[in-house]
Regions:
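Hydrophobic core of transmembrane alpha-helices in multi-pass small-molecule transporters
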Residues: 39, 118-138, 244, 323-340
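C-terminal ends and interior cores of transmembrane alpha-helices
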Residues: 102-117, 307-324
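Glycine-rich segments within core transmembrane alpha-helices of 12-TM secondary carriers
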Residues: 157-179
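C-terminal membrane-cytosol helix-exit motif in multi-pass small-molecule transporters
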Residues: 202-222
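Intracellular juxtamembrane helix-capping segments at the cytosolic ends
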Residues: 135-149, 337-349
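Helix-to-loop junctions at the C-terminal end of transmembrane segments
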Residues: 79-93, 179, 285-298
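A membrane-interface helix-boundary motif in multi-pass transporters
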Residues: 179-205
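Helix-loop boundary and gating motifs at the non-cytosolic
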Residues: 11-78, 234-278
Length: 349
């Protein structure tokens, strides 16, 4: 399907908004269903990425517990990718996708139900979150590929990126302010763990609604084909080495912010504020780089992102103070979009 252009009326903001809604309605049904699903789940991802770590830090102050949780998460992801290939032969892809979203709420509920945080319970919650990520990402890209074509893919990814940016700005700020205010003002009799449980309910509700929406789609499951390989093209092996570098940096992204901010800077409010400001900076930076760079700049952009991570880590290691954390977070905020912008186009090529 070719992208269609709807001329918007020269009215106010509401007229233009209705014009965009009408334009959205011109796209295929499955594409619209998937976009609405991803829009809802975009408001869940910042919660599970940021505030599970702060919950562990607040209730245990054990850095090893946060690391153990993340190790469990990233152990569960590749295992789920493998088993998902078998399950897709017998289970509808929308059900697997929905199951992945619902498991994120289950993982948080398991964590909140632990009377005393112990490493065993944290690892169980982490493995469940790894299953969630695995089922979610293993099926999301196929659904996007099968629901779009070359003519409307730019619109799809543009709108999806817009949803993700809005969620990355709004959710950390709001959740961080809510949790911080609970601790500072004694809401719920000063029981901040109850506030975390309310956040978990919020996650559950969104995942249930998102699952109901995606199940309305008429998505076809992929053909039964081989999905396990042991020999790869030389170019693919080079890509995997690049992925290792990105994975090392990704470990800092998911682990370091909550530990460092809760230990050296402040509380959930500080973390949420830093992440919201960072999301705005990232959005502007990505737009400018996407607008003014070309394919020949990709390796340089990726390398600049890695260099920023290294510089931020060095500053934090030397200073190990609130100032060092802020410098590290700034480098992380600038380095992450640089790495994504350089890496993903190389991957798709």
């Amino acid at each position: 399907m070719k992208e269609t252009t709807v001329a918007g009326p020269k009215g106010g903001i509401f007229s233009r908004a209705f014009s965009e809604i009408r334009h959205f309605g011109t796209y295929p049904f499955n594409m619209r269903v998937l976009l609405l699903t991803n829009m809802l789940y975009a408001f869940v991802l910042p919660v599970v990425e940021l505030f599970v770590g702060t919950y562990i830090m607040r209730n245990s102050s054990e850095l090893a517990y946060v690391v153990g949780y993340q190790l469990a998460v990233y152990t569960g992801i590749p295992l789920t990718f493998f088993f998902n290939g078998f399950l897709m032969r017998h289970v509808r892809i929308t059900h697997l996708y929905s199951f992945g979203m619902l498991l994120s709420g289950v993982s948080m509920a398991v964590m909140m139900s632990l009377e005393t945080l112990a490493l065993g319970g944290i690892i169980v919650a982490g493995l469940i979150m790894g299953l969630s990520y695995g089922f979610f990402w293993a099926n999301r890209d196929f659904l996007a590929l099968s629901s779009t074509d070359d003519g409307n893919r730019n619109y799809y990814y543009g709108l999806e990126s817009f949803f993700n940016t809005v969620a990355s700005v709004v959710v950390p700020g709001m959740i961080g302010a809510f949790l911080g205010a609970t601790a500072d003002h004694g809401w719920f009799a000063g029981n901040i763990n109850f506030a975390y449980k309310l956040v978990t309910v919020f996650v559950f509700v969104l995942t249930i609604v998102a699952s109901a929406v995606v199940c309305r789609g008429r998505f076809a499951s992929p053909a039964r084909e081989r999905f396990v390989y042991f020999r790869f093209d030389r170019l693919w092996n080079k890509m995997m080495r690049l992925a290792v570098l990105k994975g090392i940096a990704q470990g800092y992204i998911v682990t370091a912010p909550s530990m460092l901010v809760m230990t050296l800077v402040g509380n959930e409010t500080t973390l949420g504020t830093l992440q919201s400001i960072g999301a705005l900076v990232s959005a502007v930076l990505l737009y400018l780089l996407g607008r003014f760079t070309s394919s020949r700049h990709r390796v340089a952009i990726f390398s600049a992102g890695l260099l920023l991570f290294a510089l931020g880590g060095a500053f934090n290691a030397v200073l190990y103070s609130a100032t060092g954390v802020i410098v590290f977070m700034l480098c992380l905020v600038l380095g992450r979009p640089l790495m994504d912008l350089g890496y993903f186009p190389i991957q798709l090529r």
